[in-house]
Amino acid sequence: MGRPGYVYIMASQRNGTIYLGATSDLPKRVHEHREGLIEGFTKKYGCKLLVWFEAYDDLQEARATELRMKNWNRQWKLKRIERMNPEWNDLWFEIVK
């Protein structure tokens, strides 16, 4: 087994633009998105709120889940967010405690 991994969703606002990603270091990666340190989609569309994440024992498993979820339609992703986080609260402070 390799290092742990995470699948996560960033959003611009409730029901706004969403971005799905995977990483081995969730706090670092979310910080990069929040501060606009990563050029690309999240910076362009202002996806700075961590609204959903899931931990995996292995980064490869997280990446496989990310790829599956990227093929999901938007409604399925929104349902996933709302099951864990119905108010679309920013979960940043939960991961940096």
Q: Which stretches of residues belong to each language-model region?
A:
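GIY-YIG nuclease catalytic motif and its immediate N-terminal context
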Residues: 1-39, 43-55, 60-70, 84-97
